[in-house]
Amino acid sequence: MNTLPLISVFSKPWPSHSAANLSDVLLSLGFKGIELPIREGFQVTPDTIEKALPKFASELRQNGLGVFSIAGDVDEVTIRACGESGIPILRTMLKLDSTISYQENVDTFRRQCEELYPAIQDSGVSIGLQNHCDGFACSSLSVIHAIEPLRSDCVSAVLDLGHTGLEGEREDLAIDIAWPRLSMINLKNAIRFPDGTDAAGAVKWNRTWVSGKE
């Protein structure tokens, strides 16, 4: 029995490739699957997802490339399209509305997920909540806190190690915290670096994406 983890790549850099061309490129790089962004300007958009996602996913599989997850809207249409396409994870993030409290943002997300339980269970899909930086739920702890009372067969944790780096979170601790509900890890690397000072003399910090060894 093969217990090696599945390794996919976010297909964001190839928004206009056909299924055949995208498969050729990524299979040549050694990948067996992708995470597909559902966005305007890409192969599948929020408006076309019902018909376009099953079709595009089927074409990719015919060319030897799987779709392991999508990044898209959390709604019933998207969930059912994932189910029809055989895609197990719908990745999302919790963007914080600054006009309400953090807990109110979390409660809104939880209610949204609970209302979608029937569609999630019918479709065999998991909503994967990912950490992000800045104005989002930004740590492994915030992700686990948000999803903790939700059904584990319906909502899971996705950990992005680039954003743990930007937030100054230790990667090993972040993985340990998220592990009980973890469905996917995003492997990328980012750092903050000093970039001059402001008028008050405080250091300004910028960010950059770097190779894994840095």
Predicted features along the sequence, with ranges:
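Active-site acidic/histidine proton-transfer and metal-coordination neighborhood
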Residues: 20-24, 59-62, 66-157, 166
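A short, Lys/Arg-enriched amphipathic alpha-helix followed by its capping loop at the start of a domain
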Residues: 2-7, 25-32
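Acidic/histidine-rich catalytic cores of soluble enzymes
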Residues: 118-214
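Glycine-rich, proline-tolerant flexible connector loops at the mouths of alpha/beta enzymes
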Residues: 35-57, 61, 100-101
